[in-house]
Amino acid sequence: DGVEPTAENIENGTYTVSRPFNVATKGELTNEAAQDFMNYIMSTEGQAIVEEEGYIPVDGAEAFTSTNPSGSVTVSGSSSVSPLMEKLKEAYETVNPNVSIELQTSDSTTGMTNTINGMCDIGMASRELKQEELDAGLVNTVIATDGIAIIVNNESPIDELTSEQVRDIYLGNITDWSELG
């Protein structure tokens, strides 16, 4: 669509190829350590890490104040969210060394299923939650937005694609560059 994939364009919606990084819990968190970690993720300090790692932070973050709980937290899911979550985990554990966080990397659906089944405290998804996941009691929180750059080989005669063309390529409706004529 002729729009550069910059943070500003992703935030203002003119560049539309992006996805949310969601975390989900089964209803209200009862694990005090997990709630404290969630508060950290959504804080000014947590969102600064989101931005440092190249993602778009959420608005409205406030300074973090820990309740200083102890215990363990299990986070499960998306391999796309996992590298960011690892950075957030490391930073939080320096703020509160009395909490141990186990990060289980798999995929978004496994993370949501594990959360629904009580196998983890927090699930990670690099997509919107499905209606059946919400119906099962999951509560999602967007922790970041991930802009996705569409890259074409320099040797290709194509120097710009529309959103519809990209969609059709990924759906298999366009299978040859000549079809973009």
Locations of regions flagged by a protein language model:
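Exported/periplasmic ABC-transporter solute-binding proteins
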Residues: 1-181
